[in-house]
Amino acid sequence: ALEVMSRFAANPKWLIYLPPTMSPCETSHEPGLLEHPTEAFAYYRYEGIEQVVCEEKHMGSRAVVIICRSEDVARQRFGVTGEGIGICYTRTGRRFFDDAALEAELLSRIRAALDVRGFWQTFSTDWVCLDCELMPWSVKAQALLLHQYAAVGAASRSALGEAVNLLEQAQAAGQDVDELLIKFRTQKQLTGQYVEAYRHYCWPVHSVADLKLAPFHILATQDEVHVNKGHAWHMDTLAQLCQADSELLLATPYKVVNVNDTSSLEEGIAWWHELTGRGGEGMVVKPSDFIARGRSGLVQPAVKCRGSEYLRIIYGPEYDLPENLERLRQRGLGRKRSLALREFALGIEGLERFVRSEPLRRVHECVFGVLALESEPVDPRL
């Protein structure tokens, strides 16, 4: 963690928080599905949590945004000079943008929205730390898209297209290749779905006008870490902020579900089907309280429930064939969930220390701890 920070991180004076990883819900036994909301709701019901907040999951990149009211505030509170009014950094503490002008314009737009909504006066603060998702996915994952997903898609479509053509010719010539042709046609179709799945989350970025930022947590302001407020409060408060610049800021749709009420559960499941049916990644299910305790102690701060087409990007074009799905259902979540809880606790503790004006080294004990945990081996598909 220390090596990564020393070689790649942004100015460490900005790094007061790193977000935790997130576990998926338990594996579903619904036909043809690996993940389904039923398991997410069942987890929280088992833990004694009655009400959950379901938020649309954006397919972008996690971003922590710190905005100061002025450069003087950045100097006085963060000890940073000559770097503008804030920063946008990744979940591993690296600067999100290589283009400093693009970052500066993004931060300026967010500050203007905060000005318009009277945020500084409402919260009696001169700075804010926001937890966000920045879209498109391709703005940060361009190399991954080109060298992993697009390369696989292009090679597969080319090879399978040629194979299907040859098999069709063989069939026309009277060869017994019917089963083989069906198999390769299925593979070709699934590869096409794979390509369409990742294309949905990519578009060119030439300026800040091509970006969308979806803030979902007000993490901290001058004298407070806002973990004492429920997720619905965060959603509603940030939705008001997003109205001040709807071209850049995206309010996250959400739905409150009572996990003990059948009709409420059905509405939550139907909403998930609606989100994934139009190409969305899925949803994140959280207990209504920011910090919640259940039968086993601290419960997962969030679990993700992803749609079948998005999972095609993660597990490969043919993941949902019956023989593959049965194998994938054996995945284990224990390690991922343990990491999520520890990283969540460290993240909040780091913010609390910063708000209490403890020395930066004390804040960085928590920040570096999160980064160290993230270096532990765990299935990256979870």
Indicate where each model-derived feature is located.
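Low-complexity, highly charged intrinsically disordered N-terminal segments
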Residues: 1-39
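Short acidic, glycine/serine/threonine-rich loops at helix termini
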Residues: 66-69, 100-101, 141-147, 295-296
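Non-catalytic, alpha-helical, charged scaffold/linker segments
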Residues: 114-210
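Conserved loop->alpha-helix
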Residues: 80-136
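Nucleic-acid 5′ end/cap handling module spanning
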Residues: 34-90, 182-382
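Short, hydrophobic/amphipathic alpha-helical patches that form generic packing surfaces
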Residues: 3, 131-137, 214-223
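Short acidic, S/G/P-rich loop/turn micro-motifs used as interaction or catalytic elements
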Residues: 95, 135-139, 290-292, 320-321
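Short linear interaction motifs
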Residues: 31-50, 107-123, 138, 264-266
